[in-house]
């Protein structure tokens, strides 16, 4: 991409052309448009011609505008080729008289976006050369010779096409042939305009025509040439530097002032426009007693920074008074007041400055050279705002080269720098501005979290469990986690704590993440049984008697589903029991429950599908009797009498003697026949 790159090269992007086209279409309306009729031009009668006065009158009445605005709009329409003149084709303006005009065919409108190629223009020039027998305009001859050299390899094709078009044109009648010639000429006057005419289709950097410049066909006078020579001589006298030196100065300036840039480096103690803290304005007041350290350090950058700051000027004035040259800064301030003060008081202020600083024997007389004094005194005869610029510049350079360097080394500046305060950064409020907003770490993407969750589930499912090993399916795990909603530990005052529960009422489970100590996840009941099997065996060996059996998971589920305590039901045959178990699993486990809760022997389920909080529920709930129902896995194995544990993920746990009998170890799946 270059500096002259326009993008979408040479395509008319002017939106107003569409508005002009809509207006031209209204003009051609046979009922409400411009009045058109056959007009005789030379020896030919041209159809659908109109006069310039009729066009202007229609524009004024249609758009309700003045005659001057209508004339300007009409010139636009003609210059862009929507209307072309019949009598003076080169003069692309709309004359408010009886001059004849005609509408251009839509094929030649600028918005058709087909390029005006050199081949088409060469064919047009060759056809005119044949028709006029070599009599062309000067610029047309130059273009003809240039295109002949440029397209010499296919010039025979150009000549052949020109002859064919000329032969086809002779077969038309005289009126159509004349109208077509005028249309082509008007098109090429717009797209290949003669020298000295403005190309209306140029835009951007291509539009270099200045309407005020001297025309090409006019000769320059001696005065104009002398002015041009003087301009170039002054341009040669200007000092120039290399681009590398200029860029180096810009980089140095940026590095020097970067710490004082409130946008790039921030401001101390805080930005008052963001934090609503006005301490920054209080510390940086114009004549504050103790300025900030950053403000005092900035005075050492250059003399303009010092003299621009009111506090810096006050300190510098104190230094100049000690050196008996305070009148220099006073004169500079008086000149600034004259330059930017009221216009009505310019003469009065100029006289006061002259009497105080410039007159012989003045009270605060300044020391300037005689030449500058003569220029100043001569200008005071007719005072204006800038009459003292010469004297002001002289005093400014004197202070910059002499007094400024000594001020930076003086104890006044060093004491000011030592006493300057350095405010600490205060806590900012949340900001909506991007350059002052504190950058926060973005949270992980939900897609990544979902992938991690799926990977964890896949790893858990990949852990094979051998459920045929004896003595590994008993005893609840001491580390249990039951997920029932959002993650929040129960409060001590929760109505679900052990101290607040009533053993006679069902439990409503809150949506909480209830954890026991040292727990991480909520394992499946089979996995809990596998991990706790070794502890159960040791417990069975060392204890002679066991605690009374607590309710099983399915018994607790039956108790929570029924509104009253269930009564004992007779056992069903094995196959009927299998079908009943599978139907209840689909009805209760899949349809009624929002999630598949993994329950432990001490987590009774309730009818609303949530999980009861962990605790001493098993000891408080009464012994329940339920039907013997099979689940996906029915685990039958030897259970010690009065062990206080029950089978997990099963509804086989019965009551009475059937639950106390030792049975043979077997695994029954729902896809196998009992």
UniProtKB/Swiss-Prot annotation:
Residues 533-573 are annotated as: Disordered. Residues 219-280 form the G protein gamma domain. The keyword Ligase does not apply. Residues 298-413 form the RGS domain. It comes from Homo sapiens (Human). Residues 30-105 form the DEP domain. One of its GO terms (cellular component) is plasma membrane. It holds the Pfam family RGS_DHEX. GO terms for biological process: dark adaptation; G protein-coupled dopamine receptor signaling pathway; G protein-coupled receptor signaling pathway; intracellular signal transduction; light adaption; negative regulation of signal transduction; nervous system development; regulation of calcium ion export across plasma membrane. Highly expressed in the caudate and putamen, lower levels found in the hypothalamus and nucleus accumbens and very low levels in cerebellum. Not expressed in globus pallidus or cingulate cortex. Isoform 2 is expressed predominantly in pineal gland and retina. Isoform 3 is expressed in retina (abundant in photoreceptors). It is linked to Prolonged electroretinal response suppression 1: A form of bradyopsia, an ocular disorder characterized by prolonged electroretinal response suppression leading to difficulties adjusting to changes in luminance, normal to subnormal acuity and photophobia. PERRS1 is an autosomal recessive form with onset in childhood. Retinal isoform 3 is light-dependent phosphorylated at 'Ser-478'. Phosphorylation is decreased by light exposition. Heterodimer with GNB5. Interacts with RGS7BP, leading to regulate the subcellular location of the heterodimer formed with GNB5. Component of the RGS9-1-Gbeta5 complex composed of RGS9 (RGS9-1), Gbeta5 (GNB5) and RGS9BP. Interacts with PDE6G and GNAT1. One of its GO terms (molecular function) is GTPase activator activity. It comes from the Eukaryota. This is Regulator of G-protein signaling 9. In photoreceptor cells the DEP domain is essential for targeting RGS9 to the outer rod segments. Keywords: Disease variant, Membrane, Phosphoprotein, Sensory transduction, Signal transduction inhibitor, Vision. The lineage of its organism: Eukaryota, Metazoa, Chordata, Craniata, Vertebrata. Inhibits signal transduction by increasing the GTPase activity of G protein alpha subunits thereby driving them into their inactive GDP-bound form. Binds to GNAT1. Involved in phototransduction; key element in the recovery phase of visual transduction.
